[in-house]
């Protein structure tokens, strides 16, 4: 099971691969849409990659609740537990 810091780091790598954003700009308090300018298509790719990387399932209806990077970290952390 990954720690929250490992999840954050892993998500930053996934976001970087999808968007080209530097990993150090992917912080827990950043909004996927407002701060990182991630559209819904990119978000779905990020979710799929996160599911694979962390061996979790993130149902589509839950994705809309993942507004910030921190929301996603907490969700993945809980889903692993």
From Swiss-Prot:
InterPro entries in the cross-refs: ACP (IPR003231), ACP-like_sf (IPR036736), PP-bd_ACP (IPR009081)
Recorded superkingdom: Bacteria
Pathway note: Lipid metabolism; fatty acid biosynthesis
UniProt domain Carrier: residue ranges: 2-80
Post-translational note: 4'-phosphopantetheine is transferred from CoA to a specific serine of apo-ACP by AcpS. This modification is essential for activity because fatty acids are bound in thioester linkage to the sulfhydryl of the prosthetic group.
Cell location: Cytoplasm
Pfam families: PP-binding (PF00550)
GO biological process, one term: lipid A biosynthetic process
Family: Belongs to the acyl carrier protein (ACP) family.
NCBIfam families: PRK00982.1-1, PRK00982.1-2, PRK00982.1-4
PANTHER family (alphabetical): ACYL CARRIER PROTEIN (PTHR20863), CARRIER DOMAIN-CONTAINING PROTEIN (PTHR20863:SF76)
Function, in words: Carrier of the growing fatty acid chain in fatty acid biosynthesis.
Name used for this protein in its record: Acyl carrier protein
Gene source species: Kineococcus radiotolerans (strain ATCC BAA-149 / DSM 14245 / SRS30216)
Gene label: acpP
């Amino acid at each position: 099971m990954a720690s929250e810091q490992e999840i954050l780091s892993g998500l930053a790598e996934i976001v970087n691969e999808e968007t080209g954003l530097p990993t150090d700009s992917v912080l827990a308090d950043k909004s996927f849409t407002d701060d990182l300018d991630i559209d819904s298509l990119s978000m779905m790719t990020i979710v799929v990659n996160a599911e694979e990387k962390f061996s979790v399932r993130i149902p589509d209806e839950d994705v809309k609740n993942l507004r910030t990077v921190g929301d996603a970290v907490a969700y993945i952390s809980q889903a692993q537990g």
